[in-house]
């Protein structure tokens, strides 16, 4: 039986879109979407070949953002509104490298979820 080839889905790319940067303590994930939220390009520190503690570095975030913005720029994205979520290291360097990649950053919004005293946090590490 012949192997089914994966069909690449068509995403309508407008000149303006959104960049979602999810920065955790372990990894950073960057998604560039159109206004509807359909993903144009995505990248992460793990996808770029970083492993372990190297994934949570500003350099890894920079490399992931460069890779992502290059693909989106070729697709036709020109301006983005950046949504940043999480406490990780590479937030600023990811925004800076999206801007240096040729995509204009119009707005930066922090959407980090803050509990109104919800779940008990994990215990403090003693090293």
Swiss-Prot record:
Coiled-coil portions: none
Pfam families membership: Ribosomal_S11
Molecular function in Gene Ontology: rRNA binding; structural constituent of ribosome
Record PROSITE patterns: RIBOSOMAL_S11
GO CC terms: ribonucleoprotein complex; ribosome
Cross-referenced InterPro entries: Ribosomal_uS11, Ribosomal_uS11_bac-type, Ribosomal_uS11_CS, Ribosomal_uS11_sf
Keywords tagged on the record: Ribonucleoprotein, Ribosomal protein, RNA-binding, rRNA-binding
Entry keyword annotation includes Cytoplasm: no
Any one of the GO BP annotations: translation
Family (UniProt): Belongs to the universal ribosomal protein uS11 family.
Function comment: Located on the platform of the 30S subunit, it bridges several disparate RNA helices of the 16S rRNA. Forms part of the Shine-Dalgarno cleft in the 70S ribosome.
Subunit structure: Part of the 30S ribosomal subunit. Interacts with proteins S7 and S18. Binds to IF-3.
PANTHER family, per the entry: 40S RIBOSOMAL PROTEIN S14/30S RIBOSOMAL PROTEIN S11
Protein name, UniProt field: Small ribosomal subunit protein uS11
Native organism: Flavobacterium johnsoniae (strain ATCC 17061 / DSM 2064 / JCM 8514 / BCRC 14874 / CCUG 350202 / NBRC 14942 / NCIMB 11054 / UW101) (Cytophaga johnsonae)
Taxonomic classification: Bacteria, Pseudomonadati, Bacteroidota, Flavobacteriia, Flavobacteriales
């Amino acid at each position: 039986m012949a192997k089914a080839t994966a069909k690449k889905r068509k995403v309508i790319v407008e000149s303006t879109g959104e960049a979602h940067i999810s920065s955790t303590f372990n990894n950073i994930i960057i998604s560039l979407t159109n206004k509807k939220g359909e993903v144009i390009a995505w990248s992460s520190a793990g996808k770029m070949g970083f492993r372990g503690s190297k994934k949570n570095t500003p350099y890894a975030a920079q490399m992931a953002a460069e890779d992502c913005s290059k693909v989106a720029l070729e697709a036709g994205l020109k301006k983005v509104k950046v949504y940043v979520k999480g406490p990780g290291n590479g937030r600023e360097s990811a925004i800076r490298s999206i801007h240096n990649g040729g995509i204009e950053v119009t707005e930066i919004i922090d959407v980090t979820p803050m509990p109104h005293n919800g779940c008990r946090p994990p215990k403090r590490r003693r090293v």
